[in-house]
Amino acid sequence: MAWTKYQLFLAGLMLVTGSINTLSAKWADNFVAEGCGGSQEHSFKHPFVQAVGMFLGEFSCLAAFYLLKCQGRRQSASSVEPQQPFNTLLFLPPALCDMTGTSIMYVALNMTSASSFQMLRGAVIIFTGLFSVAFLDRRLAPSQWLGILITIAGLVVVGLADLLSKHDSQHKLSEVITGDLLIIMAQIIIAIQMVLEEKFVYKHNIHPLQAVGIEGFFGFVILSLLLVPMFYIPTASFSGNPRGVLEDALDAFCQVGRQPLIALALLGNISSIAFFNFSGISVTKELSATTRMVLDTLRTIVIWAFTLALGWEIFYPLQILGFLILLMGTALYNGLHRPLLAFLSRRWRLPTQEGEQERLLGDSRTPINEAS
């Protein structure tokens, strides 16, 4: 069945905005500008400020939800299904997981390449699968277990590619290892978030845009408040800002004022996450969850291609092998092998059936009344 223009638009929107989301965050990290008080030029290393911006983008999904709801009231058929009452605080635990996992990933993105960052995020299926078995009493198919094992192998190969690659002054080997481990740690937290959402949230038939928006609201408010104590927590040289504190939000705003392109990168990150969530949910509804997974894989390829073209990282053949193994594991876990096996089975049966028909016709060439 051919895709409609609207479906093609949604798929393209998801691919483009998903790629912009990671690339804009990495672009902001690459900027160098003066900070507050005439401090020397330094890199824009403000992961928690970036995380606040991302949650602001998620929070804006609430606006999209209410727009759809208002549009549905004007029309006879609403795209927003009626819901049963629910307690908004149900979203607090998954929002805290989202806030923690996202903040860790933004810290990690300062330490490793954008392509490795995107590839290692595939580890989420390992922990989601294990937690689903442990807490949701779900039984995984043998192909899903195999997909998890293959994904682990892919993560090992991607990690080896980072270890064996040459590192510049911006990304030292110790930083890359720490960054990769932080990404894996963040996927454990994101997997807990997914299990919590499935166990406590989705049974209330809540619209996904509303769910993302409420989680974005909690994340934005809580993390914005946490920026105050972070301004005073010393972390020595780990933070990368002149004051050596966990997060210096004032320094971030000063750098944005002195280098306006940082504001453009942050705006790209905020707006892209909103459109990415909307298009991802719409792709699942209009097409399928499998299509969404395939587009997410294509997003990794786009990010990788752009970072290579822009000179942000160097090409390493071992990374291709790791990506292909990860792709195979993800495909198996999500059941992408089933349509392929069904297609091959049909192709195999067709020649066999044609051969049987030829044999039957060949055997029946002599009329029955002449057989005696």
Curated annotation (Swiss-Prot):
All residue ranges annotated as the EamA domain in the record: 105-160
GO biological process terms, alphabetically, are: negative regulation of mitochondrial outer membrane permeabilization involved in apoptotic signaling pathway; positive regulation of cell population proliferation
Any idea which UniProt keywords this protein has? Glycoprotein, Lysosome, Membrane, Mitochondrion, Phosphoprotein, Signal, Transmembrane, Transmembrane helix, Transport
Tell me one GO molecular function of this protein.
transmembrane transporter activity
Entry-annotated residues carrying Phosphothreonine: T366
- GO cellular component terms, A-Z: cytosol; lysosomal membrane; lysosome; mitochondrion; nucleoplasm
Compartments where found:
Mitochondrion; Lysosome membrane
Give the signal peptide range. 1-18
Q: Transmembrane region positions?
A: 48-68, 89-109, 116-136, 145-165, 176-196, 211-231, 261-281, 293-312, 320-336
Entry-linked InterPro entries:
SLC35_F1/F2/F6 (IPR009262), UCP036436 (IPR012404)
Q: How does it sit in the membrane?
A: Multi-pass membrane protein
What residues bear carbohydrate chains?
N110
Q: Where is it chiefly localized? A: mitochondrion
A Pfam family of the record is: SLC35F
Annotated family: Belongs to the SLC35F solute transporter family.
Subunit structure of this entry?
Interacts with SLC25A5.
- Functional summary from the UniProt entry: Involved in the maintenance of mitochondrial membrane potential in pancreatic ductal adenocarcinoma (PDAC) cells. Promotes pancreatic ductal adenocarcinoma (PDAC) cell growth. May play a role as a nucleotide-sugar transporter.
| PANTHER family, per database record | PTHR13146, SOLUTE CARRIER FAMILY 35 MEMBER F6
Protein name in the entry: Solute carrier family 35 member F6
